[in-house]
């Protein structure tokens, strides 16, 4: 068994999401907007819903407009349940 599988089983199944940073004004915290797309059961129209979540950014490296990957984690504060894994694309 690989090392990644062992660590994932110890931590449990954690959701990894991708979104854009909309705020970085707090210390060690970023606000990421996540988009979810679902198809309506009857009319088959694609519905988009947006949700803003707070994520932990230890080094304060993410900026507004960056495309980031975040991972679900234990509650770090009242509102913070995600942590920054990587910056996929920096804002222009």
From Swiss-Prot:
One of the primary rRNA binding proteins, it binds specifically to the 5'-end of 16S ribosomal RNA. The gene is rpsQ. GO terms for cellular component: cytosolic small ribosomal subunit. Part of the 30S ribosomal subunit. NCBIfam families: PRK05610.1, uS17_bact. This is Small ribosomal subunit protein uS17. Pfam families: Ribosomal_S17. One of its GO terms (biological process) is translation. PROSITE patterns: RIBOSOMAL_S17 (PS00056). Belongs to the universal ribosomal protein uS17 family. The keyword Ion transport does not apply. One of its GO terms (molecular function) is rRNA binding. Keywords: Ribonucleoprotein, Ribosomal protein, RNA-binding, rRNA-binding. InterPro entries: NA-bd_OB-fold (IPR012340), Ribosomal_uS17 (IPR000266), Ribosomal_uS17_bact/chlr (IPR019984), Ribosomal_uS17_CS (IPR019979).
């Amino acid at each position: 068994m690989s090392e990644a599988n062992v660590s994932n089983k110890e931590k449990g199944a954690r959701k990894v999401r991708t979104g854009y940073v909309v705020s970085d004004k707090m210390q060690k915290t970023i606000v990421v907007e996540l988009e979810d797309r679902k198809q309506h059961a009857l009319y088959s129209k694609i519905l988009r819903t947006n949700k803003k979540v707070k994520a932990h950014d230890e080094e304060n490296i993410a900026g507004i407009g960056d495309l980031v990957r975040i991972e679900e984690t234990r509650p770090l504060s009242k509102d913070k349940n995600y942590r920054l894994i990587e910056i996929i694309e920096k804002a222009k």
